[in-house]
Amino acid sequence: MSELAMSNEEVFFKWSPDYSVDIKTIDNQHQELICILNHLFIAVSRRQADKEIAVILDDLVGYTKTHFALEERLMQQANYEGFEAHKLEHKKLIERLDQLGKKFMLEEKPIHFELLSFLKSWLKEHIQDSDKKYSSALQKKGFSIAAWESEATAAFIEMVEKTGRWWKKIW
C-alpha cells in the first residue's frame, strides 16, 4: 500500500479505546481497517489517480476478508451462539465491497464520500455492537483468548503467505 502522510485534519475515522473488544489481535486488526479506510478517504479527497485508489480499495477488501475469516474462526472455535448472524453481516458487507470494486474498476464509477461514510458507520456500529457481543460472550464462557490469539497469528501469517498480501509486515 502506498504511504500517505496524514495530518490530523485528514483523519476521517479515528480509533477510540471505546471500540476495543478486549481481544488484542482483533483490536489491532480493527485499527488497521480504520487506517486503510483513512488512506482511501485521503486518496479520494486528493483526487488521486484511479490506479492508486484501486490499490487501496483492493487492500481494504482483501484485509477485510482476511479479518472476517479469522474472526469467524474464533467464533466457531468458541461455539458462539450468534455466529451465523454475525457471519451473515460479514457476507453482506463483503458483497457490497465487491460490487463497489467492480463498479469502480469495470464501469469506472467514482468512489463517493457517501460510500466512505457508509463504511465508517458500518465498521463503527459493527465493532461496538456485534463484535462486542461475541467478545463478551466468549469471555463469560471462559474461552481462552490467549490460546486463540497465538493460533490466530499463525493462521493469519499462513493466509498472507498464500495471498502474498502486504499486511504480513504488521504482525
Report each predicted region and the residues it spans.
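Small-residue-biased structural context
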Residues: 2-171
